[in-house]
Amino acid sequence: MARPVTLCTLQWGDLPLDVICEKAKSFGFDGVELGLPSHLDVRQTDPEYYRNIKVTLDKYGLQLFCISNHLVGQAICDNIDQRHKSVLPDYIWGDGDPDGVHLRAVENMIQAAHAARMLGVDTVVGFTGSSIWQWLYYFPPVTDEMVNEGYADFARRFIPILDEYQKLGVRFALEVHPTEIAFDTYSARKALEAIDYHPAFGFNYDPSHLGYQGVDYVDFISQFPDRIFHVHMKDVYWSDTPKQIGVFGGHSTFGDARRFWNFRSLGRGKI
């Protein structure tokens, strides 16, 4: 069955909504996935604000199926530091005090659910962040208790958000991705277990974040058929031979030819 193909606007945050919609239509897309904060301010409560967005989409014959709140979501469970200032809006970063950043990020994620309702969509795609990503490699030794506390922290922060989403009939789709509480099949299962399989929580499936890790990205679909709420289509290449920079990335930038893996456009990778 053919499905609509939409353009996620996050990478075009420097362009006004009207411009990116015009381009998306000319590129042949069926719709857009509106990215926060550049193309949607979920703090707005005036229905006219959301009507104007719909008018813009209708002007170009574009559909809307979900909105994205990745950057703010990252600040919910992360241990906040100076890196976050570069990706967070000023109204989330504030004075940079971690407790304040966490609280404002949670509030904004709940506002995103209300915005989704105003726009007539039922899915918010985003990140969660993770208090335990820094312990990915088990040296110095990482205990089960430390890891379990990380998942408990995720549950404490996200269950109240998910409860609000459920009341509104909106779902949260975590993009399974490095630096999030779920970054492969095993951690995705642990995340679901931590929140007792909350009905408002599922996944945004992007196999490009799984393949280079050695994760069976087809099996992921089989494991969570009812929890995949949205899909991102992106490709990734990983080398058939050893490289100078391994799977961890070697503190190099994306695109470096010495890397074992790099993201690529559809059809130019190995997915």
Name each model feature, range by range:
Residues 1-15:
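Boundary/entry segment of secreted carbohydrate-active catalytic domains
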Residues 19, 31-32, 67, 148-265:
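Acidic/histidine-rich catalytic cores of soluble enzymes
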Residues 18-37, 118-123:
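Catalytic domains of carbohydrate-active enzymes, especially glycoside hydrolases
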Residues 42-64, 142-145, 170, 259-262:
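Short acidic, glycine/proline-enriched helix-loop-strand junctions
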Residues 14, 18, 59, 76-203:
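Active-site acidic/histidine proton-transfer and metal-coordination neighborhood
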Residues 269-271:
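A short, acidic, amphipathic alpha-helical segment used as a generic capping/interface helix at domain edges
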